[in-house]
Amino acid sequence: MTYDTKVTALIMAGKRSGALDPLAERAGVAQKAVVPVNGVPMVARVADAIAACPEVATIRIIAHEPDEIAAQPGIAKLIEEGRLSFAPGKFNIVDSVFSGAEDADFPLLITTADNCLVTPEGYSEFIGKCLEAQAGGAAGLARKEDVQAADPEGQKRFYEFRDGGFSNCNMYWIGSAKALSAAEIMREGGQFVKFPRRIIKAFGLVNLIRFRFGTGSKEKLFEQVSKRFGFKLVPVELSDGHFAIDVDNERTFAVTEKILKRREGDRTSA
């Protein structure tokens, strides 16, 4: 099924206050978003993939230091074409999302600057499934077995539900201005596998118990959260486990670069 809806894409490219990311320090750059992976800055890879997705009209990068990002050739080209602009990063991820969403045309696709393995087809798959579900909000997930098949070192932690293990793909959907309140789920920083107590504040105690003991399905969890927010939130299962592997540290950097070299050849000396 095809849809005429055009999407605004937000790329979260902020940096943590007061600390230089270790990957950025090693690469000799000021922020993680411009660290090269197989010869191409991370944020440029993500922007290129999104720009090649036919469902996306405009792109906004939310950044604390936009000048270094804007100087990247691929980014500069998209700016010149009028497809890409910047919004200021804020103190936390939720307020940064609100900054990026200001005066934007909905629906919104939200992703991160380190999501280097998602293809244009992957973004299209996510957008299509969100539209088909008529979702007010959504999160992209990949099955544990698919992620491990992509690379066994790509992810170490998974959300365990009654219907299997899943990993977050750092793809989110905000269907309308009303649904923007769903971003509050991330107010404490997300990373619920690492910090389960955050689920109490975001989802409630009963859902924390279901999450910890794998007694509920992902659909049930999203259904309960939908009731809390007053609009439809859905889990979107994606077909490729690579989409759940992003660049968080040296291990996942090495995994991502290895996969990219396999896809496109070695570009580190280009």
Task: Name each model-derived stretch.
Residues F253-K258:
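Short amphipathic alpha-helices within nucleic acid-binding modules
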Residues T119-S226, L238-H242:
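Conserved core of the sugar-phosphate nucleotidyltransferase
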Residues F106-D114:
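Short beta-strand-to-loop acidic/aromatic patch adjacent to the donor-nucleotide binding site
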Residues R26-R45:
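Short catalytic helix/loop segments, enriched in acidic residues and glycine
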Residues M1-G28:
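N-terminal nucleotide-binding beta1-loop-alpha1 segment
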Residues N249:
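Short, conserved phosphate/pyrophosphate- and ester-handling motifs at nucleotide-, phospho-/glycolipid
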Residues V234-E237, D246:
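Conserved active-site beta-strand element of glycosyltransferases/polysaccharide synthases
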Residues T2-I11, V40-P107, T215-G216:
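Conserved N-terminal catalytic core of the sugar/cofactor nucleotidyltransferase
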